[in-house]
Amino acid sequence: MVHLNKTIQEGDNPDLTAERLTATFDTHAMAAQIYGGEMRARRRREITAKLAEIPELHDSMPLPYMTREEKIMESARKLTVLTQRMSEIIDPTDAGELYHLNNEVLGIEGNPMALHGVMFIPALNAQASDEQQAKWLIRALRREIIGTYAQTEMGHGTNLQNLETTATYDIGTQEFVLHTPKITALKWWPGNLGKSSNYAVVVAHMYIKGKNFGPHTFMVPLRDEKTHKPLPGITIGDIGPKMAYNIVDNGFLGFNNYRIPRTNLLMRHTKVEADGTYIKPPHAKINYSAMVHVRSYMLTGQAIMLSYALNIATRYSAVRRQGQIDKNEPEVKVLEYQTQQHRLFPFIARAYAFQFAGAETVKLYERVLKEMKSGNVSLMADLHALTSGLKSVVTHQTGEGIEQARMACGGHGYSMASYISEIYGVAIGGCTYEGENMVMLLQLARYLVKSAALVKSGKASQLGPLVAYLGARSEPTSLIDRVPNGGITEYIKTFQHIAKRQTLKAANKFFGLMENGEKREIAWNKSSVELNRASRLHTRLFIVEAFARRVNEIGDITIKEALSDLLHLHVNYELLDVATYALEDGFMSSTQLDYVRDQLYFYLQKIRPNAVSLLDSWEFSDRELRSVLGRRDGHVYENLFKWAKESPLNKTDVLPSVDTYLKPMMEKARQSKL
């Protein structure tokens, strides 16, 4: 029999199969929506199937039972096998296929080349000249060298203008002299910098004839290509264990008057001639392209990690029976409780929303990158602002959702057998890397304040498409409860009203402080909380709109209905979360707020039959999830016991610590009692 849910197999836990039999849509068709087309979804399944047939690519034991050194060795082993066999499994030039391959085999804890493909190659692709790409990019793509991106320092991260590493041009030798003037100038945190990489794209302040030309990027050799030992003038190493992501050797890097050729300055957009003449880039933010690249792709990565945790928690909630709703009936599935649904389902909606918003942002990034190659950087400021806000909101809400998923699993969620704690640790790193979240919101706020200034000066026609709503006329009150089924358009108008009101309020506070004599920087700081609120609301509006646009594009009725239910759940949940802003000026009434609550509870119930299938549609294999609680077959308890028995502590009945310390202590206590 052909089922709509394609994950059903004989012998599965009947409670989980029962959930899957209530699906109202084909999970393969939903996967096509998630991953950008039927071909991409099918390729993911084909890659997963091929990988399952290669035993050398399987973990030798569960990762939680390995030491950090063992994990790094295991990851390097699998990475080497992948490099040898990659071309028979995927198209190495396809970023989506490569990402899935890495997730399946190397997992979320990282690998010795994690930054190589995510930041090093994109930096060379975006900022190196054609000649430089011929020299370095080809070698990087062939994995002849391993590289990373070194920007963050011990003393400064997001504040690029105050980075302390210097690159001073020596006209006599036509070399840049890289130097770390003090301990806070050490590069600190770059992934794979500590032990794996032999090259790095380094960000340093460039000095020519005593003048600081600001931060620029340089291609810097770090280690001897034959011995892998650090080159003279280089101080380099691992910064130690972290909250998660410990297969990655995040490192430190210092320079002692270390010389590199002038031509190691990445020169696609900026140049330094032999005589020290500086040719500036066409746009001030053009060198941000590597970070914007990561922020654009981070969104779908965060959506996947949120979906990992939700898969685990929702499947487990479908097989875990606890308590009774009706005392005359047997114990019920935890998923039957409205509180559990309210804890998980809105985050299922967010995962889809983040995926669709992320896909839209990646398309915009690819458009900007293409235009940059021909010298057009007009959209970079818009993209930088958008990705700053999205990066902040999405990483924060993803962390919230993963933690809710862990707690939804009860005590077993705390075990590494659930693997949710590792997912959480990896995901929340995104709240601080590639820009600390509060600072990211303020970067978007600068864009919003400039837009508000246009509105204030009567130049709303000059607003870009992302902020056009700031100059549009608003309805006097929300019409949410007056349109059948709570029309999505009315919800969007409500979000627009809220975002517009808060943006103009925050901007007016900033403008007012300056008009009253405050210095710009002081006025900005005193307005920053309100400005960040505006940035969050603007970003959440964009996510809602992106979700709605995606649903409107879908032709398959069953898929459209299922995603429309998720969209309705999303807008009601999100609106309840920010309702204070709509109540403050009377745009919404308390009666309308009650209506929104009722709609939320209605859609929790409506989504209930599809909950497991909406997550199965992401089509994660058991190897990718690495979770006993989230197993596809639902056989949790017997495998939880099996997993526990694999603990290295269970290889012996009596631990050396007992023989050495605890047993003598107890014996001494017994003797003293006598």
UniProtKB/Swiss-Prot annotation:
Its cofactor is FAD. It comes from the Eukaryota. Keywords: ATP-binding, FAD, Fatty acid metabolism, Flavoprotein, Lipid metabolism, Nucleotide-binding, Oxidoreductase, Peroxisome. Pfam families: ACOX (PF01756), ACOX_C_alpha1 (PF22924), Acyl-CoA_ox_N (PF14749). Changing residue 301 to E: Reduced catalytic activity toward ascaroside asc-C9-CoA, but not toward fatty acyl-CoA substrates. Has a slight activity toward asc-omega-C5-CoA. Activated by ATP. ATP binding leads to a conformational change that promotes FAD cofactor binding and enzyme activity. ATP binding likely occurs during acox-1.1 folding and/or dimer formation. Its EC number is 1.3.3.-, 1.3.3.6. ATP binds at residues 342, 392, 396, 404, 533-536, 581. One of its GO terms (cellular component) is peroxisomal matrix. Substrate binds at residues 285-288, 295, 433-434. Disruption phenotype: RNAi-mediated knockdown abolishes production of dauer pheromone daumone 2, severely reduces production of daumone 3 and increases production of daumone 1. GO terms for molecular function: acyl-CoA oxidase activity; ATP binding; FAD binding; fatty acid binding; flavin adenine dinucleotide binding. Pathway: Lipid metabolism; peroxisomal fatty acid beta-oxidation. Changing residue 189 to A: Loss of ATP and FAD binding. Its main location: other. It is found in: Peroxisome. Gene3D superfamilies: Acyl-CoA dehydrogenase/oxidase, N-terminal domain (1.10.540.10), Butyryl-CoA Dehydrogenase, subunit A, domain 2 (2.40.110.10), Butyryl-CoA Dehydrogenase, subunit A, domain 3 (1.20.140.10). FAD binds at residues 149-152, 157-158, 191, 320, 340-343, 411, 436. One of its GO terms (biological process) is pheromone biosynthetic process. Belongs to the acyl-CoA oxidase family. PANTHER family: ACYL-COENZYME A OXIDASE ACOX-1.1, ELECTRON TRANSPORT OXIDOREDUCTASE. Involved in the first step of peroxisomal beta-oxidation by catalyzing the desaturation of fatty acid-derived side chains. Specifically, catalyzes the desaturation of fatty acids heptanoyl-CoA (C7), nonanoyl-CoA (C9), dodecanoyl-CoA (C12) and to a lesser extent pentanoyl-CoA (C5) and hexadecanoyl-CoA (C16), and hydroxylated fatty acid hydroxynonanoyl-CoA. Also, catalyzes the desaturation fatty acid-derived side chains of ascaroside pheromones, which regulates development and behavior. Homodimer. Forms a heterodimer with acox-1.2. Forms a heterodimer with acox-1.3; the interaction may be important for the stability of acox-1.3. This is Acyl-coenzyme A oxidase acox-1.1. It comes from Caenorhabditis elegans. The gene is acox-1.1.
